[in-house]
Amino acid sequence: MSIRRSVLVAAVLCALSVLCAPQGQADPSGAGGGGCRQGSVMTGRLVPGTGSAGQNIRRAATLRECVSSLLPGIGAGQFSVTIPWNAPGATSAATFAWSDGSVSAATGFGNGLWLITDGPASGHGIQVDVADSWNGWYYSYADVAVTSATFLS
């Protein structure tokens, strides 16, 4: 009986050390390609388009405190995309208009992960992170807070 109790106590202590460890906030300027540490509320509104019922969702958010070797001299940007409503497999074209006047074009599937295809950071992926575990890019036009944007490659 004491072996079982010892194993149980060890398992509980191990789980508690993982669960109680301080949870850090993503730091886009750390390891990797950097990114933007803050974002605004990402707006969403229905517009005529190619999605279900002939509707698209237009989204826009401001990205601030950008620090990355992929964005030299750039401190902020404006993210915008139009996503076909209720069409999760459809690709979308997004733009990042940067504070130095340059523009990056990107493609993605409306899940927050975008591949930059032209302009600054071309060839790299960027994840636009939102406050909740939200999966509403193409299902909902509700506004949602953007917490950061992080380069993944």
Label each residue range with its predicted role:
Residues 1-26:
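Secretory targeting and sorting signals
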Residues 10-11, 55, 143:
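A short, structural micro-pattern
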Residues 26-37:
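Cleaved targeting-peptide boundary
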Residues 35-46:
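N-terminal export/targeting and maturation segments
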Residues 44-123:
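Predominantly extracellular/secreted and cell-surface proteins with exposed
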Residues 120-153:
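Extracellularly exposed regions in secreted/surface proteins, prominently low-complexity, repeat-rich
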